[in-house]
Amino acid sequence: MLLSRFQQQLTQHFPQQPNVLLSLSGGIDSVVLLDLFSRTTTPLRAIYIHHGLSANADNWADFCEALCKQYNIPFILQKVTVDKSTGIEAGARTARYKAIAEHIQANEILATAHHLNDQAETFLLALKRGSGVKGLSAMQIVSHRQNMTIFRPLLSTTKKEIQQYAKQQQLCWIEDESNQNNHYDRNFLRNQILPLLLQRWPQFNQMIARSAKHCTAQQQLLAELLDEELHRYANIDEKSLQISQFKHFSPLKQQQLIRLWLAKCDIPMPTSAQFEQIISGFLNSATDKHPQLRLKNWTLRRFQKTLYLTPQLANTQHFCQILSVNQTIDLPDNLGQLTRQPQQIIYQQTHKTNRLLLPESLRTVPLTIKLHQTGKVKRYQHPHSEEMKKLYQQAKIPVWQRTRTILVFFEDQLVDLLTQHKNQQNND
């Protein structure tokens, strides 16, 4: 029976009862999942994402709200704007998860109604794209995305079982007219290809699920075998990967370490052509080169013998502001905050704090804060001018950070650079 199997999945994967945010579309799958959860004592909320792609979306939102009132479950309606540049399906999925991430609470898991037929479709779509074992692993019953835990308790349940349950419980649901549009790859597989395959091989979906499970096992084993080395070279918090030893590794091992690093950083996986570019342009080029590669909303960069992932960076090079004693200023583009005290400047960014100790002669005078400087500059209490490029290199500041590094000036003289790397001190 579907209910008992559902309860078993819930207990197996979450022995301590979780709080659940259910992704509710109003279709038969999510309505059945809502009904199943309602028959447990699980604390439950539901969210409907209004993509604005159908003229019926308002009616579907009203249906979901009424359904949640019937079940006495808190309901969230969230409208989103879909970026169609990467395709409607991908854009809708990205917008949906982004909206859910904004609403889900720290103690909640996300429950979705993906089932066995969806798993088969996902596997075949990955096969069409030429995916490796990670892509062919398809969906997992429990997975993680954007710091969310996602639970798919119906993943081993067939569409027919869901339909039978809905009929037995006399449930009501809506039909999305776009599901019949075979222009979309998933619908083409669902409506035309899989019915033929199931007619020939009735257990085809179960066999696909088995293959996906084998791929998952291979991917997990690979990650386990390389985890120690990845830990040695990668800094996940800073999204950096040290590659000085990669010349001793085979191209396959190089690629797998980069794949695992990107996955841990929750970055979209590059295409095969992009991986070839990473191996040739990032790992095998001269250390004085500064290649970069766009990966969706991130940019892969290299400085010296380290790879870095950076988000889209705003232009901050023209920032210039006076910093007086006992004053606090906010830096642009989330670069942090500076607080001036008589003896020091305190730099705070996220959970990091750094201090620049000021010499006696500068403790009462106004100082100027800049984020960029080129050419030669006179150092405070130094006899000669120096090239900023040399100072940046000495401080090991990557090229793209040189328009985002705090420079403390007294009049036209550079007092020091203030970074997150180390405490700094200037003495008379």
Swiss-Prot record:
> Binding of ATP: at which residues?
S25, G26, G27, I28, D29, S30
Report the EC number(s), separated by commas if there are several.
6.3.4.19
Q: Which top EC class is given?
A: ligase
Q: Which GO terms describe its molecular function?
A: ATP binding; tRNA(Ile)-lysidine synthase activity
What UniProt keywords are attached to this protein's entry?
A: ATP-binding, Cytoplasm, Ligase, Nucleotide-binding, tRNA processing
The record's section on InterPro entries has:
Lysidine-tRNA-synth_C, Rossmann-like_a/b/a_fold, TilS/TtcA_N, tRNA_Ile_lys_synt, tRNA_Ile_lys_synt_N, tRNA_Ile_lys_synt_subst-bd
**Chemical reaction(s) catalysed:** cytidine(34) in tRNA(Ile2) + L-lysine + ATP = lysidine(34) in tRNA(Ile2) + AMP + diphosphate + H(+)
Q: Does the keyword Metal-binding apply?
A: no
GO cellular component terms, A-Z: cytoplasm
Q: CDD domains of this UniProt entry? A: TilS_N
The written remark on domains in the entry is: The N-terminal region contains the highly conserved SGGXDS motif, predicted to be a P-loop motif involved in ATP binding.
Q: What is this protein called?
A: tRNA(Ile)-lysidine synthase
Q: Give the species.
A: Haemophilus ducreyi (strain 35000HP / ATCC 700724)
What gene is behind this protein?
tilS
